[in-house]
């Protein structure tokens, strides 16, 4: 995947090994990963997980994009993803993660909106899913702002989660 995107304020570049250390550093902030299962300790398992997600080919239209502000194009702010659910599918899911200094500024919503647009208009998908920990108010707000509809409460890897979806009809209705 070599798709680059822009929004009014952001640059979205395919995430590469150039972004590896910035991703690890972001994950080491316990506030960033407090609602996420996994070993976020900088150890071998953590590093291998991040490396595998960076190096994996998710297909022509899917992947992870590193987020940068146009005003500071070398300052890593986080990532947004559009990949097969849990990396295996068949459903396609959106995700996002930001460094703490980027929280509360509309960055995740702006980046996610652009990737949603790509998913429906560029990749031609019919449905996208997303989930977030039930207490992660920031991610839940992003999902709603972007246009995801709440579907159900459940669990993800043993953690209380809220599950969302957006269909092509939902996307089209928001564009009118």
What does each of the following model-derived ranges do?
Residues 1-101, 117-118, 122, 131-133, ...:
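GNAT-family acyltransferases
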Residues 96-98, 104-121, 137-145:
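Conserved acetyl-CoA-binding loop-helix of GNAT-fold acetyltransferases
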């Amino acid at each position: 995947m070599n798709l680059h995107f822009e929004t009014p304020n952001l640059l979205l570049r395919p995430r590469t090994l150039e972004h590896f250390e910035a991703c690890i550093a972001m994950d080491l902030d316990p506030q960033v990963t407090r609602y996420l299962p996994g070993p976020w300790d900088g150890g071998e398992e953590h590093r291998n997980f991040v490396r595998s997600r960076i190096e994996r080919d998710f297909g022509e239209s899917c992947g992870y994009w590193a987020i940068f502000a146009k005003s500071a194009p070398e300052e890593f702010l986080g990532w947004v993803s559009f990949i097969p659910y849990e990396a295996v599918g068949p459903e396609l899911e959106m995700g996002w993660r930001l460094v703490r200094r980027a929280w509360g500024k509309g960055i995740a919503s702006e980046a996610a909106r652009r990737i949603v647009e790509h998913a429906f208009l560029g990749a031609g998908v019919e449905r996208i899913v997303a989930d977030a920990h039930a207490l992660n108010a920031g991610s839940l707000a992003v999902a709603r702002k972007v246009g995801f509809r709440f579907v159900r409460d459940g669990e993800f890897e043993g953690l209380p989660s809220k599950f969302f979806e957006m269909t092509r009809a939902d996307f089209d209705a928001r564009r009118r």
